[in-house]
């Protein structure tokens, strides 16, 4: 999970990250938060977020600038079944929009739902 400032809201954290990247607008931030099921108007500090909300904010950060390559490590960690379905749909849309998505996960059902190619790490070898 990326390092976010615990005393800031999710949106404020993304705004700070957006200042480090050229061309990130308020609309981009709100769109990314909405895409992962977070309310940009939520005034809770990051430290009050559940594990699933923290994971969603990390995914929002990853998609903020609509990158061509998205790397996600265990993105379903702490996310409930409704959130996983939302994430599956989001990843399908990003793939259709031209992004390449690399996911590491122990959740085989999730991988089957979102990947076109799947490799398994076993005894230090990729298969």
What do the predicted segments below correspond to?
Residues 66:
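Conserved catalytic motifs of ABC-family nucleotide-binding domains
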């Amino acid at each position: 999970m990326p390092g976010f400032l615990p005393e800031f809201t999710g949106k404020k954290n993304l705004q700070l990250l957006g200042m480090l990247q050229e061309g990130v607008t308020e609309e981009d931030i709100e769109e990314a938060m909405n895409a992962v099921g977070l309310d940009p108007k939520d005034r809770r500090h990051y430290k009050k977020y559940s594990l699933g909300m923290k994971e969603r904010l990390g995914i929002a950060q990853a998609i903020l600038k609509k990158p061509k390559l998205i790397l996600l490590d265990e993105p379903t960690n702490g996310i409930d079944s409704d959130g996983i379905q939302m994430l599956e749909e989001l990843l399908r849309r990003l793939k259709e929009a031209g992004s390449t998505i690399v996911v590491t996960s122990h959740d085989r059902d999730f991988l089957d739902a979102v990947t076109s190619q799947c490799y398994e790490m076993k005894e230090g070898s990729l298969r």
